[in-house]
């Protein structure tokens, strides 16, 4: 008889937390509810995570690692400025769409009433993404000798705001309004405007 694979309890707890965030929008997740979902006692939860804040930090670590590692791939593999920007924004939107519960953490919705440090961490993720966008836009000037009529920092902020807005709509609609819906058409318009500037 084959032995069943050992469950990584820590990962299982985080998966259950993400699922609960997806299936219970607008509701506060308590450790008692999470323990029941995982099928363990609250004490067992605390053996793996010293606090609920640490559980959310585990999800934030997953978000940061997933996004930044893929952004680095985009930066290494793609050299065209507009394509890089498109892929980076698309990455954010697809990630949120594929991980609805986690998108509530990214958006900050699930962190209301939690430790301020958690909201700061998600803010730092968006700051890192914005820094990458600024770098991409500034490199256009270096590579092509022609920049934009508007400061790259302002443009990077605008592009990030588009993605953040789509994620916020997704969360607000209880995951009905997909962040990637109409993105191709929207990107075409945005790209035209950027290239005209």
Curated annotation (Swiss-Prot):
Record feature DNA-binding region, as residue ranges: 30-49
Gene3D superfamilies hit by this protein: Tetracycline Repressor, domain 2
SUPFAM superfamilies the UniProt entry points to: Homeodomain-like (SSF46689)
Cellular component GO terms held in the UniProt record: bacterial nucleoid; cytoplasm
Pfam families on file: SlmA-like_C (PF22276), TetR_N (PF00440)
PROSITE patterns the record matches: HTH_TETR_2 (PS50977)
Domain HTH tetR-type residues, every copy: 7-67
Cell location: Cytoplasm, Nucleoid
One Gene Ontology MF term: sequence-specific DNA binding
InterPro entries: Homeodomain-like_sf (IPR009057), HTH-type_Tx_Regulator (IPR050624), HTH_TetR (IPR001647), NO_SlmA (IPR023769), SlmA-like_C (IPR054580)
Protein name listed in UniProt: Nucleoid occlusion factor SlmA
């Amino acid at each position: 008889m084959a032995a069943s694979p050992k469950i990584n309890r820590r990962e299982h707890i985080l998966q259950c937390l993400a699922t609960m965030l997806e299936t219970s929008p607008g509701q506060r997740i308590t450790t008692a509810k999470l323990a029941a979902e995982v099928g363990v006692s609250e004490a067992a939860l605390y053996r793996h995570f010293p606090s609920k804040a640490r559980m959310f930090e585990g999800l934030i670590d997953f978000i940061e690692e997933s996004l930044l590692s893929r952004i680095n791939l985009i930066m290494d593999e793609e050299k065209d400025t507009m394509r890089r920007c498109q892929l980076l924004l698309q990455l954010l939107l697809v990630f949120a769409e594929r991980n609805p519960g986690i998108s509530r953490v990214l958006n900050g919705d699930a962190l209301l009433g939690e430790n301020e440090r958690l909201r700061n961490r998600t803010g730092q993720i968006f700051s890192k993404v914005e820094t990458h966008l600024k770098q991409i836009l500034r490199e256009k000037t270096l590579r092509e000798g022609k920049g934009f009529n508007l400061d790259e920092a302002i443009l990077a902020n605008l592009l990030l705001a588009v993605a953040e807005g789509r994620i916020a709509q997704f969360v607000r609609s209880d995951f009905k309004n997909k962040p990637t819906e109409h993105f191709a058409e929207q990107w075409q318009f945005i790209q035209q405007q950027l290239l005209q500037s």
